[in-house]
Amino acid sequence: MKKAYPVINRVECKACERCIIACPRKVLYMSNKINERGYHYVEYRGEGCNGCGNCYYTCPEINAIEVHIERCEDGDTDG
């Protein structure tokens, strides 16, 4: 089984919440913390991401979120 997870750039995130709404697994949430630009930012719950990329595709900020998918032992990304 592949392991996928979002990586959020806390400085670039502007708390628009589009990724939270787009996530079918509801693994993202708005942090109570504030970044250096004065915005709250999104955080990952730590498990449950299926690697669909909805968060990445709906984010209006370039480089604010990426989805990483780890390779399986055989080098493939399929589980």
UniProtKB/Swiss-Prot annotation:
Could you say which EC number(s) this protein's record lists? 1.2.7.7
Names of required cofactors: [4Fe-4S] cluster
Gene3D superfamilies listed in its UniProt record? 3.30.70.20
- Summarize how pH affects activity: Optimum pH is 9.7.
Its recorded reaction(s) are: 3-methyl-2-oxobutanoate + 2 oxidized [2Fe-2S]-[ferredoxin] + CoA = 2-methylpropanoyl-CoA + 2 reduced [2Fe-2S]-[ferredoxin] + CO2 + H(+)
User: Cofactor stoichiometry and binding?
Assistant: Binds 2 [4Fe-4S] clusters.
Keyword flag Flavoprotein: no
Q: Where is the 4Fe-4S ferredoxin-type domain?
A: 4-33, 40-70
Keyword Electron transport on entry: yes
Q: Which UniProt keywords apply?
A: 4Fe-4S, Electron transport, Iron, Iron-sulfur, Metal-binding, Oxidoreductase, Repeat, Transport
> Quick one: which residues bind [4Fe-4S] cluster 1?
C13, C16, C19, C59
The membrane spanning regions, by residue number, are none
- Spell out the subunit comment: Heterotrimer of the VorA, VorB and VorC subunits.
Could you identify this protein by its name? Ketoisovalerate oxidoreductase subunit VorC
Its source organism is: Methanothermobacter marburgensis (strain ATCC BAA-927 / DSM 2133 / JCM 14651 / NBRC 100331 / OCM 82 / Marburg)
Classification of source organism:
Archaea, Methanobacteriati, Methanobacteriota, Methanomada group, Methanobacteria
- Gene symbol here is vorC
